[in-house]
């Protein structure tokens, strides 16, 4: 076991054997380190050692799998270094490359390659690119619908199309089929699940609603909602009885409570008919008038609460009891044939799609898991019990343990696969259900929760639950803040899990105390922006809450701008300081250098719930303020003017009779006409399409315009001809060259980004043609499909994430990462519940919930199953949003800052402080589940803290919060900001800048406030070490090695003389073959790619050369220059044998090494701490456990009288060795130059 100090819980997770283990690892708990240590422990167990290829290690991304393999390799290398004579450890390192450390998709693909013959699959099958799969699905849908329309009996299908197809065509029904197909794929037996969907709507004559299995859940929902109404009435009654309260209201409120209370008795046996009669019979009396001295505030609050209760009760009636039970029953019966036909249509699509893929030798990502299940399930399997096949039993015997990372994100299909390849007690599952945020990918956190509850029972023998609650990431201030919030809001009912002692974080991070350094300690900052002056009217309907309007989009834009400006100012104050205190506000801990350093832009990250449509606003505002910012924006690509213009050009090459694209191209720099020219062209032919007008105008007497059009039409005809002959990628590159558009956009503002966007289009076209689809028309159709579905390619990257910039990313992208300073913005933005408005809802357990549509009257209303499913989806979505918030807050290492905007702070405060004085830690479940945004959780929780007194004061509430909550050790700093103040401040800055520019332009004097001297000081500043500025700050090893060589010769008393011999010009040489440098590069490429699993022979080298030519890694003339005997000679040598036997070999390994400037440039005077970055690439580095063997390849010819290779390359090799020792921390025990021309081994 490693020397690392493990906690007792970590040690248990590492060492516990012979049982299924579920490790609930909280954020920052070091789960990956524990997982790696467990694997090493299994391999090195002195009693029952396991080979690394006897482990199945499943991760959820390729990057995670690669990191896991690397970390296991490092741990094995370290173990081998401590025990260099262990043949077993050396063998484990050798086997590591073939070990099953993989994503589940890759595991399934490997199984398909081995057992394809069981599936009627072409052995040469390939996995379809998502683009190809999407296009194929569209083709299949069109063919399927065409078949359905041509069938004799289409009555049910026609009704299905009319009901759910959309207003103009059947596109919405096609989308519904695709959605249902994808959704069913998360079920282990999708066809059986689809077939069962209509069962909920089979209601025989004589049966009632009470005979339906789902009616009890509907009643439960109604009872809960009625309890919420009762709670509001009780709050109003309590206010009425307070001193100064509206006492006359008490009698009416008591009557209300007496009338409503019987409906909350959870009478499950009560018939729907009885429930209908009871609820619709409720009447509301008028409140008695209040006389005398009454507190108006208490009176208004009591009135508002009762009005809210009445509204909620009326909503219950309108939602569930708008029709007689007999009417509802008949409507449900009418849905059965529609649901059955929809399921049948989806199954037909599935089968036809499968046939098309098999015909093309394709599988898609959805197939991988289901094909794998087919292999692993016994052929006589039934749905009630998943029995393993012979292949599954064989795999069970092969794998000593199955280890699963991120288990909280598993789905039912994946769980079934893992169960089938596992023994009874050899599963190790690690994850954190509080971080399960992939519901949109159909992840099922309930699988984790059910195991957690089962294994937590000590009497259970199926497995053991171990909790890792120590957080080694965040400062105590962050840990306390997270615990304070989630103790109150994450309940079993609202968040699907109780945030108790088992789940809360315990601080384990060690941030050294620094008395002379200001660190990032201090309260969590919360900025609340009041949008009241935006003058946007509040919309109170449910539909307005769940559906964005244009007004809300404008509101979001204003909120984003305001938040960005506020954040920008806070960042500038952090990094640059303020007028009162210049310089960075605090220092952050840097693990790499082991000390505190000033906070910089790269330490800061801004998290948004989603970056789509929002990150660009933040980017624009922050960059305007001078804050360097980076965001990997997933949208905006198709809106980029250069992409739009070029797609228009491709469209008219495909079909020039498209008016809008044609006009766009003519107006663009590709042709360069003015708007007036376009008007003149249209006047030449007022009828017909614009292309005809262009042709007529080209032949008319229009001067330069006619000349330009003639040239363009000639080019267009040539391009259309090339489009029929050339590949799509070649056509696009030809257009870039011939139009000069690629170079043109490079000269525009943001030219680098624009050119990158055009390159993405070229590469996307290349990827498209690698599929089974071809042609410009299909490519354009695919692009339009992407646009219509709201998908995007994402703007190309033109800036590295590692630069000193503030990064903006989505919360989902941040998962698994950590940041010194974290802003979580957009906390007032509404949760996206738009999916709840669809005509058809689907749920994995409850089935389908359709809208009932009467085609004759076009009247529609939600069916009871839809209402149930809607409620369940909303509940699950709210729980997921709570987990998303948990992920966001736990990314912070040292400083956490929360920012949100609200429409009306006064109204929001009234809502937030409703339960401030409730006893106990948790807030009411009804209030938590009714949240519309993250602030609806954060602010009610903070209002109960002693730092939340401002929230309580502004809400005008009295009393003391629950003492245990109020005295919590977390610390909060609340800052209130009006939107108008942020806008005014920004406007003032603009006006000041504009006024200053006007005065400068008019050469008028202005008050400098000491600025002139400061400007003069900055402009006259000179670098103190002018000599250093004449030398490069970055150099390659080959550039500086001569300086070390010369120094070494001087120390040895050797002087070299190398006469300069000018080579003949290339055109005078008889042999125009490769230069020595080019031949050397070719040898390096071969040595980089040659397999090391066996001794290469001449035939093997020839095969490798052909493969490298096919992959365009090597040119044919380079391959011709390679002598296979030189390659085989290397591996036959003693050095080559050491390479083949080594457990780990790195080839073409790049490095960067910072050296003192005086060490590189000895002629310079003392340069203080000036450094030079030296970069190089090591040809071959062999890890032999106790040290490295460093090999440098040379293809130089050695002639008599020349310096020996030792003299020529000593400096270079010594630099390489120094870099290895400094960076990897292990000595280089042997330094070798291998000369390929004569097979000589030269030791340095």
Curated annotation (Swiss-Prot):
GO molecular function, one term: 3'-5' DNA helicase activity
Reactions performed catalytically: Couples ATP hydrolysis with the unwinding of duplex DNA by translocating in the 3'-5' direction; ATP + H2O = ADP + phosphate + H(+)
Region (Disordered): 538-559
One cellular component term from this protein's GO annotations in UniProt: DNA helicase complex
Residue ranges occupied by any UvrD-like helicase ATP-binding domain in the UniProt entry: 4-475
EC number: 3.1.-.-, 5.6.2.4
Domain (UvrD-like helicase C-terminal) ranges: 515-816
Binding-site positions, ATP: 25-32
Gene3D superfamilies: 3.90.320.10, P-loop containing nucleotide triphosphate hydrolases
Free-text function comment from the UniProt entry: The heterodimer acts as both an ATP-dependent DNA helicase and an ATP-dependent, dual-direction single-stranded exonuclease. Recognizes the chi site generating a DNA molecule suitable for the initiation of homologous recombination. The AddA nuclease domain is required for chi fragment generation; this subunit has the helicase and 3' -> 5' nuclease activities.
Record-stated family: Belongs to the helicase family. AddA subfamily.
Protein's UniProt name: ATP-dependent helicase/nuclease subunit A
Organism: Desulforamulus reducens (strain ATCC BAA-1160 / DSM 100696 / MI-1) (Desulfotomaculum reducens)
């Amino acid at each position: 076991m490693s020397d690392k100090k493990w906690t007792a819980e970590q040690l248990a997770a590492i060492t516990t054997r012979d049982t299924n283990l579920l490790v609930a690892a909280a954020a920052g708990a070091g789960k990956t380190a524990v997982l790696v240590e467990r694997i090493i422990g299994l391999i090195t167990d002195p009693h029952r050692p396991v080979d690394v290829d006897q482990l199945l290690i499943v991760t959820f991304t390729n990057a995670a799998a690669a990191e896991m393999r690397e970390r296991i390799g490092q741990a094995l290398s370290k173990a081998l270094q401590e025990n260099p004579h262990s043949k077993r450890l050396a063998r484990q390192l050798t086997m590591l490359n073939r070990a099953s450390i993989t994503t589940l998709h890759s595991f399934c693909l490997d199984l398909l390659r081995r057992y394809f013959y069981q599936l009627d699959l072409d052995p040469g099958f390939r996995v379809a690119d998502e683009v190809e799969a999407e296009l194929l699905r569209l083709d299949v849908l069109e063919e399927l619908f065409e078949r359905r329309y041509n069938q004799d009996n289409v009555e049910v299908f026609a009704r299905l199309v009319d009901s759910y197809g959309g207003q103009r065509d059947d596109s919405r029904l096609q989308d519904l089929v695709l959605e249902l197909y994808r959704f069913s794929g998360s079920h282990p037996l999708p066809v059986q699940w689809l077939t069962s969907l209509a069962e909920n709507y089979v209601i025989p004559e004589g049966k009632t609603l009470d005979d339906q299995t789902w009616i009890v859940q509907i009643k439960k929902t109604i009872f809960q909602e009625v309890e919420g109404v009762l709670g509001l009435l009780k709050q109003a009654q309590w206010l009425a009885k307070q001193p100064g309260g509206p006492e006359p209201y008490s009698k009416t409120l008591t009557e209300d409570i007496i009338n409503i209370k019987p409906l909350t008795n959870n009478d499950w046996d009560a018939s729907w008919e009885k429930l209908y009669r009871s609820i619709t019979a409720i009447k509301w009396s008028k409140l008695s008038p209040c006389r005398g001295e009454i507190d108006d505030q208490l009176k208004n609050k009591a009135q508002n609460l009762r009005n809210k209760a009445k509204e909620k009760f009326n909503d219950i009636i309108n939602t569930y009891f708008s029709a007689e039970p007999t009417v509802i029953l008949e409507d449900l019966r009418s849905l059965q044939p529609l649901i059955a036909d929809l399921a049948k249509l989806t199954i037909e699509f599935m089968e036809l799609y499968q046939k098309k893929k098999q015909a093309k030798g394709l599988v898609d990502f959805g197939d991988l898991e289901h094909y794998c299940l087919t292999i692993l399930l016994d052929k006589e399997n039934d749905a009630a019990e998943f029995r393993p096949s012979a292949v599954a039993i064989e795999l069970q015997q092969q794998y000593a343990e199955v280890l699963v990372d991120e288990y909280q994100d598993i789905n039912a299909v994946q769980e079934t696969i893992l169960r089938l390849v596992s023994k009874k007690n050899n599963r190790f599952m690690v994850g954190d259900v509080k971080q399960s945020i992939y519901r949109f990918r159909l992840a099922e956190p309930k699988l984790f929760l059910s195991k957690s509850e089962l294994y937590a029972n000590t009497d259970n023998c199926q497995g053991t639950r171990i909790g890792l609650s120590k957080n080694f990431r965040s400062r105590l201030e962050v840990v306390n803040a997270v615990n304070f919030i989630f103790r109150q809001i994450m309940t079993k009912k609202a968040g699907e899990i109780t945030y108790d002692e088992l789940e809360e974080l315990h601080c384990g991070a060690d941030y050294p105390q620094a008395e002379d350094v200001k660190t990032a300690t201090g309260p969590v900052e919360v900025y609340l922006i009041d949008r009241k002056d935006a003058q946007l009217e509040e919309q109170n309907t449910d539909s307005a809450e769940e559906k964005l309007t244009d007004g809300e989009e404008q509101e979001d834009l204003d909120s984003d701008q305001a938040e960005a400006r506020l954040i920008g100012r806070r960042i500038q104050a952090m990094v640059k300081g303020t007028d009162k205190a210049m310089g960075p506000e605090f220092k952050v801990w840097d693990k790499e250098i082991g000390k505190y350093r000033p906070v910089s832009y790269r330490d800061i990250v801004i998290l948004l719930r989603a970056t789509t449509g929002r990150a660009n606003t933040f980017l624009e505002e922050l960059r305007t303020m001078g804050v360097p910012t980076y965001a990997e924006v997933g949208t905006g690509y198709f809106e980029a003017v250069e992409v739009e213009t070029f797609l228009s050009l491709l469209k008219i090459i495909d079909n020039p009779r498209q008016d809008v694209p044609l006009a766009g191209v003519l107006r663009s720099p590709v042709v360069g006409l003015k708007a007036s020219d376009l008007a003149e062209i249209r006047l030449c032919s007022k009828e017909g399409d614009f292309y005809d007008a262009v042709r007529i105008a080209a032949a008319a007497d229009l001067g330069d315009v006619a000349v330009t059009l003639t040239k363009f039409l000639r080019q267009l005809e040539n391009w259309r001809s090339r489009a029929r002959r050339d590949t799509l990628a070649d056509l696009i590159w030809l257009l870039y060259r011939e139009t000069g558009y690629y170079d043109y956009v490079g000269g525009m503002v943001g030219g680098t980004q624009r050119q990158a966007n055009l390159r993405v289009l070229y590469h996307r076209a290349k990827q498209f043609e690698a599929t089974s689809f071809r042609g410009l028309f299909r490519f354009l159709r695919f692009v339009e499909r992407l646009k219509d579905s709201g998908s995007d390619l994402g703007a190309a990257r033109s800036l590295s994430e590692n630069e000193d910039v503030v990064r903006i990313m989505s919360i989902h992208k941040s998962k698994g990462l950590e940041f010194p300073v974290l802003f979580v913005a957009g906390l007032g933005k509404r949760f996206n519940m738009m999916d709840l408005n669809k005509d058809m809802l689907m749920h994995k357990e409850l089935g389908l919930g359709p809208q009932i549509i009467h085609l004759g009257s076009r009247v529609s209303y939600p069916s009871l199953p839809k209402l149930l499913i809607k409620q369940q989806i909303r509940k699950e979505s709210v729980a997921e949003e709570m987990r998303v918030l948990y992920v966001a807050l736990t990314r912070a290492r040292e400083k956490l800052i929360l920012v949100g905007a609200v429409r009306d702070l006064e109204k929001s405060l009234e809502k937030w402080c409703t339960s401030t004085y409730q006893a106990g830690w948790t807030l009411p479940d009804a209030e938590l589940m009714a949240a519309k945004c993250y602030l609806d959780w954060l602010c009610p929780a903070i209002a109960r803290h002693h730092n939340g007194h401002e929230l309580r004061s502004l809400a005008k509430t009295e009393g003391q919060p629950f003492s245990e909550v109020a005295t919590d050790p977390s610390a909060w700093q609340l800052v209130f900001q009006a939107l108008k103040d942020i806008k005014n401040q920004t406007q003032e800055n603009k006006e000041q800048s504009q006024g200053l520019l006007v005065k400068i332009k008019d050469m008028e004097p202005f008050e400098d406030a000491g600025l002139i001297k400061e400007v003069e000081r900055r402009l006259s500043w000179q670098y103190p070490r002018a000599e250093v500025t004449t030398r490069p700050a970055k150099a390659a090893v080959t550039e500086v090695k001569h300086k070390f060589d010369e120094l070494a010769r001087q120390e040895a008393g050797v002087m070299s003389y190398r006469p300069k011999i000018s080579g003949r010009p290339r055109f005078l040489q008889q042999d125009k073959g490769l230069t020595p440098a080019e031949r050397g590069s070719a040898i390096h490429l071969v040595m980089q790619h040659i397999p090391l699993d066996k001794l290469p022979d001449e035939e093997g080298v020839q095969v490798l050369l052909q493969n490298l030519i096919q992959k365009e890694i090597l040119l044919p003339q380079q391959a011709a220059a390679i002598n296979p005997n030189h390659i085989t000679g290397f591996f036959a040598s003693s050095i080559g044998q050491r390479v083949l036997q080594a457990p780990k070999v790195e080839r073409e390994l790049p490095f960067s090494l910072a050296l003192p400037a005086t060490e590189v440039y000895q002629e310079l005077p003392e340069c203080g701490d000036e450094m030079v970055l030296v970069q190089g690439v090591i040809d071959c580095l062999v890890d032999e456990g106790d040290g490295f063997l460093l090999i440098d390849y040379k293809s130089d010819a050695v002639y008599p009288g020349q310096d020996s290779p030792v003299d020529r390359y000593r400096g270079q090799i010594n630099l390489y060795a120094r870099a290895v020792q400094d960076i990897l921390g292990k000595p280089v025990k042997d330094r070798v130059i291998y000369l390929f021309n004569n097979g000589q081994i030269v030791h340095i």
